[in-house]
Amino acid sequence: MKIIADENMPYVDALFGYLGKIEYVNGRTLTPKQVEDADVLLVRSVTKVNAELIKDAHKLKFVGSATIGTDHVDVDYLSLRNIYFTNAPGCNATAVGEYAFIAMLELAQRFGESLAGKVVGIVGAGNTGTAAAKCMQAYGLKVLLCDPIKALQGDTREFVSLDTIIEQADIISLHVPITKDGEHKTWYLFDEARLNKLKPNTWLLNCCRGEVIDNRALIKFKQQRDDVKLVLDVWEGEPNPMAELVALAEFATPHIAGYSLEGKARGTFMLYQKWCELLDFPVKKSLESLLPTFQFNQIVSQGDLTESQLLKLSRLVYDLRDDDVNFRGCFSTATGFDLMRKKHTYRREYSAISLTQSVDYLSDGKIDPSMLSALGFN
């Protein structure tokens, strides 16, 4: 059995190696010739899986995408060809939620503000939006959720309109899939008109798809409204973001919000589970066996934690400042953008850290130990 796998997908050999011969490829430049004799195709979001790519892949039985989204895959065509498809919904949700929360802690410190007491609007209440909301709520922040699709589907959570979020939220974090049609399309959801409605000093984070915001309109807006702070992980035209916009963002990264070791491992593992299920093979591997021991796996708390100390603790698993600096130095070429994503292998999630001494909650801005547990620390 021949398995074609994206070279940036981790743990493929550990999980699929005993099932067949693995050939690693550049997912962004994958050609029909490379997949024509494949039995299994494992991809990420950079690969467009459609008729053009797999028209000659007559042996292909399984396509797995280690992503939460499916907009890069022609699922109807795969169904027509009777090719089994699966993705990995929720695999990186925790990583994205923690990225958004850590970014907010970083903004608060940079601009001498407290995150506590702010109102956060989450646009998109799927897996990543829910994970982000969980972090914010664990920290005691008021969270407003906007997701008209979920509301129509009968989700019982309380939802508000996007206009309400724009009017009331101090921070807006975007977590929607990209859709170009329909009443609730998300392509250019934040266009020039909507950007101009943002209240003073809003923090705007985009952790989903670059085209959810009109990037050219955002450049014009930010040049006039520097009070609005931007954290951008996704860009129109990836892997070639607009240089003007990178310069204007407070924090800029190359579509790696979901790139924790845990999230990457979970994505590949979910595909492995599905493939074993499809073939009626036993699942011989475990997710836990893939992850290395974290160098700071046990932390002793010396007392109460302030917000600033929580940020320092967060930087042990992920220091956003490093990625921001590195990205600004390499984003100018598509090769640099993708190379940084490929080399992004060090980030962990809060769960990698165990706190071994409880802390007391005080009313002077210090952190409740149950809050740390709810954030994901052990």
Swiss-Prot record:
The enzyme's E.C. designation: 1.1.1.290
GO molecular function, one term: 4-phosphoerythronate dehydrogenase activity
Residues binding NAD(+), per UniProt: 147, 233, 258
Gene3D superfamilies in UniProt: 3.30.1370.170, NAD(P)-binding Rossmann-like Domain (3.40.50.720)
Catalytic activity: 4-phospho-D-erythronate + NAD(+) = (R)-3-hydroxy-2-oxo-4-phosphooxybutanoate + NADH + H(+)
Positions contributing to substrate binding: 45, 67, 259
GO biological process: 'de novo' pyridoxal 5'-phosphate biosynthetic process; pyridoxine biosynthetic process
Highest taxon listed in the record's lineage: Bacteria
Pfam families (UniProt xref): 2-Hacid_dh, 2-Hacid_dh_C, DUF3410
Family stated for the protein in its record: Belongs to the D-isomer specific 2-hydroxyacid dehydrogenase family. PdxB subfamily.
Protein name (Swiss-Prot/TrEMBL): Erythronate-4-phosphate dehydrogenase
